[in-house]
Amino acid sequence: MRENYETLVSVGTAELLPLSAFLSPSEPGRAVGGGSHADEGQEPAGCGDPQGGQPRHSLHLTALVQLVKEIPEFLFGEVKGAMDSPESESRGASLDGERASPEAAAAREPCPLRGLLSCLPDGPTSQPHLATTPTDSSCSSGPTGDGVQGSPLPIKTADKPWPTRKEGPGALGGEPSPPTHSPSRRKSHRGQERGTSEAGISPGNSPLQGLINCLKEILVPGPRHPETSPSFLPPLPSLGTSRLTRADLGPGSPPWAVKTEAVSGDCPLQGLLHCLKELPEAQDRHPSPSGVGNRRLQENPGAWKRGSGGPGYLLTPPPHPDLGAGGLLSVKMENSWVQSPPGPASCQPGRQPLSPSATGDTRGVPQPSWGPEAQAASASSSPLEALEACLKGIPPNGSSPSQLPPTSCSQNPQPGDSRSQKPELQPHRSHSEEATREPVLPLGLQSCVRDGPSRPLAPRGTPTSFSSSSSTDWDLDFGSPVGNQGQHPGKGSPPGSSPLQGLENCLKEIPVPVLRPAWPCSSAADRGPRRAEPRNWTADKEGLRAEACESARLGQGRGEAPTRSLHLVSPQVFTSSCVPACHQRGFKDPGATRPGVWRWLPEGSAPKPSPLHCLESALRGILPVRPLRFACVGGPSPSPSPGSSSSFSGSEGEDPRPEPDLWKPLPQERDRLPSCKPPVPLSPCPGGTPAGSSGGSPGEDPRRTEPRYCSGLGAGTAQDPCPVSQLEKRPRVSEASRGLELGHGRPRVAAKTHERLLPQGPPELPSESPPPELPPPEAAPPVLPASSLQPPCHCGKPLQQELHSLGAALAEKLDRLATALAGLAQEVATMRTQVNRLGRRPQGPGPMGQASWMWTLPRGPRWAHGPGHRHLPYWRQKGPTRPKPKILRGQGESCRAGDLQGLSRGTARRARPLPPDAPPAEPPGLHCSSSQQLLSSTPSCHAAPPAHPLLAHTGGHQSPLPPLVPAALPLQGASPPAASADADVPTSGVAPDGIPERPKEPSSLLGGVQRALQEELWGGEHRDPRWGAH
């Protein structure tokens, strides 16, 4: 202790305080740190104590905090004076570690990092030094109220962010209990630590390591540390939200991991540290981090006490369990968020702690901090400057493309890199807010976010946590840039912030939809689009809706998206607060018309669409449910709606559904345009047609998505029919009411819509281009069956029904065909028997019979030679079917190749008369008819198979045979009409023969075939005279 104390004194003060001074303050918290600044030595003991008794660890932390707080007094008679500069440093360093980070970082850096590394494995974090850092950050956040966290980390970053940070984390870890304590205590602690860090540049390593170990041990008891650390963790998330979130997602002590992640990314951590460091500076208005840190400590401590230390502290632990490792950051964020919803004052202070990462930055204090922080960021990294420049460009634009693009970028990366981008986004948004306030802040944030986020890109929790804090903070912060509402939670979502928020929300939605429910709603109303997006998050815990919402929102340009997001979050809240805001905005954006939304989209539209699509793709990959919905054009809308919020699903689903419509048929666009109120603005833009507020940009987004859905649907079902039905349905849904789709979305409307769509969808199909498609489906049942597979999709229901009806009709026709075939087979058998009889009978009749046979025979030469005799015996022996069947076969083939329609027409006419002929009469004329029958019977047999399809087409027995006969007729050279005329003539001329034939034929098919054969064989003119003669 003495050694540590001396080190602290040497580093922090010229004057050495008696060890007793340390002991006396440390005695109360002796268990925690013995000599707070021997506390490196003792803090490990204290840590042991916390480890020994998790419940007591908070007490140990408190004692340590007290000791730290009093240490500056002992070490520095000017607890606050020294604290302001040293304390800011100590804030920056959080405790020893944080202070040491700037001063002792050089010498300590390696040791503390190593110590942290050694400790980190023990700690919850997988990254040793980072783990410690998270502890420090979390602890510092709690005690320092994120001022420490932000300040210490930034200070560390400025000096030696990595090692110092790690040391700082240790100090913070020791301090976690202090979070509850007043900022002065933290300041004292920091002052001491600063002295310690300074004094312990070389010796400080061991003290810092000890402190880190103590903090690590304190944190190691995850349950305990989360209690103290959770409050810290909320600030931590702000510092290294993305990192923390990632770490949080992974390990039980995600904050450490997160912090570890941040620390592990030295450059990112450094940027974050600088940002946080300068945030305190901004608070204190001290050019040096210490000054800032001090002010921040003073301000944030209270705020953190209120927001983070008190509610945040308590809230954080529960969110921590909820979020788990990954959720820790979110929890932290939520702590600040919770704080922010509870009270803007506490929220702002809480945010300040958060602002180091994103929220605090935007806040009033963080904004000033950001100014120096921005400087630090600039100094820390050029990329941060670039980000800052982007952010600066964004705030002016409000939702300008510059802002949106960063958001888009962050959104796209969010799944992986998006984290870093997302933190950037938050910084961007913070910057947007600060752009009005102080563009520099974003740089610091960017340094933290960009550098840090890149490290934490892996964990998604970070974006979520970041998003959570960012969302709330952004809502508050971005509100401020747009309307200075950002500082107050929900004061308005600036146009510029909303796009960023939408992107952030999209990213957030991807990682963590759970934490957003409470504050996103409140912020949604306040923030409008931004909150709405967090709300989407919460509502879309699945992340599917949130994602869709976000995508739609992004596509919409945040005016519309917020509406959806709000709908998603809670239709009521959204409708009451956000819907008006969103609609106002949406109407603002699309209000002018779609152009308004499109303007926003144009601002960030170009970047948005691709990021949204990327997010969509990522979400689809991530979220199987949504992909399924997307897979089905109709399915996607219904899926989302039941999932989290009908309104969101509806609004987004509506867009997706109509989108394909827009994509595929413009008519549906029209439908959607009329159906949607925003459609007026949307009408200018087919993509936007769905709705000015919700359909517009989501239209684009969903469109892009929808085309896929359409493709899936089209592929699954007949693309034309399915898409048409979908399109029609979608327009109907939108027409029925955007409210249905937006408010009720697919959940309620899914059935209703389908019910309506089933009746309406089919009508639309006929009404629009679909009607032709519908008949073709009948003609081409295979397509319909394909689409029938997709009926699961709600949009496919109407198609499904149609397909079912078509299938039933087809089945009936097939049955008829089967029956006709059976009848034809019977008729063929009858024909054969009749032919045999006729073959015998022609002999009986004599020359007339022979003549008739000759006439019947198709080949005149045979007749001339008197092949009648031959034929008679031939017929008797073999039956005329074979020879004539050959001809008939050729004819049948020709029939198959011939015009089925024309044949069917001609044959249908003949066949119709034939059906009446039931009994096969055998008059003398029958001989001819019998031969013809034989011929026709054979063709009927041959043609029957082809006729089946024809029958399926025409649906009648007559139709199948008639097509065959007509085909033969065209081959013969007689047109179907001519054939029909010929048939009529023969019928009239040879009433006994022609008519008997028909009566003979029990089935109209046989009669029609016979007629056709007779016409073909006889030839029109020859038949007529001969028929008349006979």
Swiss-Prot record:
Superkingdom: Eukaryota
InterPro entries per UniProt: KRBA1, KRBA1_rpt
Phosphoprotein listed as a keyword: yes
Record field: compositional bias (Low complexity): 102-114, 372-389, 485-502, 642-651, 929-953, 966-984
Composition skew (Gly residues), residue ranges: 689-698
Pro residues bias: start-end ranges: 760-784, 913-923
Record organism: Homo sapiens
Region of interest (Disordered), ranges: 27-56, 80-208, 225-255, 281-505, 634-788, 870-1030
Ranges in a coiled coil: 799-832
Biased composition (Basic and acidic residues): 157-168, 419-437, 654-674, 1019-1030
Residue spans of biased composition, Basic residues class: 870-887
Sites bearing Phosphoserine, chain numbering: S101, S177, S182, S184, S229, S253, S355
Gene: KRBA1
Compositional bias per record (Polar residues), positions renumbered to this chain: 124-143, 397-418
Protein name (Swiss-Prot/TrEMBL): Protein KRBA1
Keyword terms of this UniProt record: Coiled coil, Phosphoprotein
Tissue: Expressed in brain (cerebellum).
Annotated SMART domains: KRBA1
Keyword flag Phosphoprotein: yes
